Amino acid sequence: MNAPALADADVRVQFPGIDDPNYISVVKQYAVEHHIHAIISLNDLELPILSSCKKEFEDIGITLIVSDKRVVDITFDKWKTKEFLKECGLNSPKTFLSLKEIEHAIDKNNISFTVVIKTRWGRSSIGIQFPESMLEMELASELIRLEISRTILSNAGGENEKNQILYQEKIEGNEYGMDVLNDLRGNYVGTFVRQKLSMRAGETDKAISVIDARFEKIGRIIGTRLRHVGNLDCDVLERDGLLYVLEMNARFGGGYPFSHESGINTVGAYIHWLEG
């Protein structure tokens, strides 16, 4: 109960953990008792749970501003994200599901060190490593598996639990946060971008707004094809003039306040859409 945001909240409430069997019923009960008409989530691990319960909330007059299961599956699973981007004709870093696959790619000079190893269903840079040799890569893989086993991510992949790690080329260059906004029916609204100047614990610490038609084109393709609901937080890297989409999160990201301060009031848009 010590999150900084609570200083600005009207009420402080401690809910059970998202893995608690009573989590949804407690949220529903609290929302009804306090006449809450809409709920958003900032937690990646909560999205799959909420997306499967949208009808339950709608039946009691509450709108969950959460995308459907298809969208959450694509954005929560970084491998499925890569496959979706490929289908859209968009650039993304070369990505591999196994140590054997990336070792083969390195042997064939299709990729070179330094590489990135991270959890397939990770969040906030959990478990990310940057090995610079084969030995480091093997050791980092074992370390990440151990870290995953000690967190809630150990159950995130379901039947894919054996492929919990992704291996990826490291793209050096400018990094951007890109918000792709759809309305509550999944219709594309706009794309808003900020260049990240510094990071802290996986979140944007300093940034400047960017206006660039290349991002608008990418955002429109993603928003139109994905048909997510509300804000989609994307990480984009630039190398040699080309843009690579790294990740997509079907929620507000830590960099949203920068867009808000520059005049993009997405929260206000939500309220307007909810009021009809």
Where are these regions (language model features)?
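Short catalytic-loop micro-motif centered on adjacent basic/acidic residues
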Residues: 38-41, 93-95, 166-168, 233
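ATP-dependent carboxylate activation and anion-phosphoryl transfer catalytic cores
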Residues: 13, 34, 200-201, 210-276
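Short, charged, surface-exposed secondary-structure boundary motifs
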Residues: 5-7, 22-25, 73-77, 125-128, ...
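Phosphate-binding site of ATP-dependent enzymes
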Residues: 141-224, 237-238, 242-244
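Active-site nucleotide/adenylate-binding loops and adjacent lid/helix of ATP-dependent enzymes
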Residues: 72-165, 172, 184-185
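Short hydrophobic patches on amphipathic alpha-helices
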Residues: 31, 106-108, 223
